Amino acid sequence: LQSMLRQNGVDAVALGPGPHMAYIADVHPHADERPCLLIATPAGAAILMPELNADEMRRQTDLPFFTWSDATGPQTALAALIQSLGIEKGTKLVQVDETMRADFALLVIEALGQPKTAFAAESVGRMRLSKDEAEKAEILRNAEIDDRAMEAAFAAIRPGVTEREIADAARAVFEEAGATPLFTIVGAGGNGAFPHYATGDQPVAV
């Protein structure tokens, strides 16, 4: 990441809790209203960490923490983090995590003096598009689980069975394989026309 930032003239990238942070640092903080940010430059990295979560998160990384409490707010700790990384106000280009909360992004932008901004998809996102052999194997393994789950769902379909029962059959395949599906959508009859339908108790009709 730091090499990519250097090559593309990016002064810093700020990541919030979520997939980007997990990919770069293998850190998985709880995503809530308290600002938690991984900020990286071509030369270093550090984390703005709520004091409430610091002890737990210390088990996941040895990156420097700049902690803050609800009593003090994050601004002073963020300023210290920025100074420690040598980021100056008037920085030309900062990438922000396109998936993080807007108030987190605004906090960073304000602290850095309103620099030009872009999305971290241009750096971290590109890195995540490149898969190593282990990641490719994991994708194939998950695709195979998906296929088995679909077969189980089709096998469960018969008159009188509810959408939820069919979804449970598919979910059981994931659970048996040690996987956790994000969601299952089963829509009987006219419900099948709804692209984001919430699986319910409608029975399958002949």
In which residue ranges do the predicted regions lie?
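Flexible, acidic/His-enriched mid-domain "rim/lid" segments that flank
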Residues: 74-179
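Fold-independent oxyanion-binding glycine-rich loops
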Residues: 17-18, 50, 97-99, 120-122, ...
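Short catalytic-site patches enriched in acidic/histidine residues
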Residues: 21-31, 121-126, 130-133, 161-206
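Short acidic-glycine loop/turn motifs at beta-strand connectors
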Residues: 39-44, 112-113, 189-191
